[in-house]
Amino acid sequence: MTTIVSVRRNGQVVIGGDGQATLGNTVMKGNVKKVRRLYNDKVIAGFAGGTADAFTLFELFERKLEMHQGHLVKAAVELAKDWRTDRMLRKLEALLAVADENSSLIITGNGDVIQPENDLIAIGSGGPYAQAAARAMLENTELSAREIVDKSLNIAGDICIYTNHFHTIEELPSKA
């Protein structure tokens, strides 16, 4: 899988992800960009799971953002509804971490839209390691959101065999 981490702190929201794509036990590519900007650079999103599935979901999510004039929560709920009820979409295996200046959300294929505690998201195979690292840094340091994301991804990459040290990190100003 992968590791995606999102942290919101001191007027910034950041999502970062590693770049490893695997097929079974083999690393197929080390520089996949699993984090991208959507909706005129007002939303950032990262995916964990199947790459082709995630690109399909990014496309669908961007359409939902357009339909709802960039309203993140409405777009996420509508995507989750479609994902849960459409037979073809139900087969897609991925998780999305999405954020704008106001909200951070996890969108799952089960139709869940989750607003995480403390605006900290960590998904994918390395998610638990990155979450523990990020939480410790949030509680015990004054590091920026970007520094916390980068260091958390490095720690996950040291522990999780499905996470590497090629990072894509995007950030936005945050009101929350």
Swiss-Prot record:
The keyword Amino-acid biosynthesis does not apply. A double ring-shaped homohexamer of HslV is capped on each side by a ring-shaped HslU homohexamer. The assembly of the HslU/HslV complex is dependent on binding of ATP. Allosterically activated by HslU binding. The gene is hslV. Na(+) binds at G157, C160, T163. GO terms for biological process: proteolysis involved in protein catabolic process. One of its GO terms (cellular component) is HslUV protease complex. This is ATP-dependent protease subunit HslV. It comes from the Bacteria. Its main location: cytoplasm. It catalyses: ATP-dependent cleavage of peptide bonds with broad specificity. It is found in: Cytoplasm. Protease subunit of a proteasome-like degradation complex believed to be a general protein degrading machinery. The active site is at T2. Gene3D superfamilies: Glutamine Phosphoribosylpyrophosphate, subunit 1, domain 1 (3.60.20.10). Keywords: Allosteric enzyme, Cytoplasm, Hydrolase, Metal-binding, Protease, Sodium, Threonine protease. Its EC number is 3.4.25.2. It holds the Pfam family Proteasome. The keyword Disulfide bond does not apply. Belongs to the peptidase T1B family. HslV subfamily. GO terms for molecular function: metal ion binding; threonine-type endopeptidase activity. The lineage of its organism: Bacteria, Pseudomonadati, Pseudomonadota, Gammaproteobacteria, Enterobacterales. It comes from Serratia proteamaculans (strain 568).
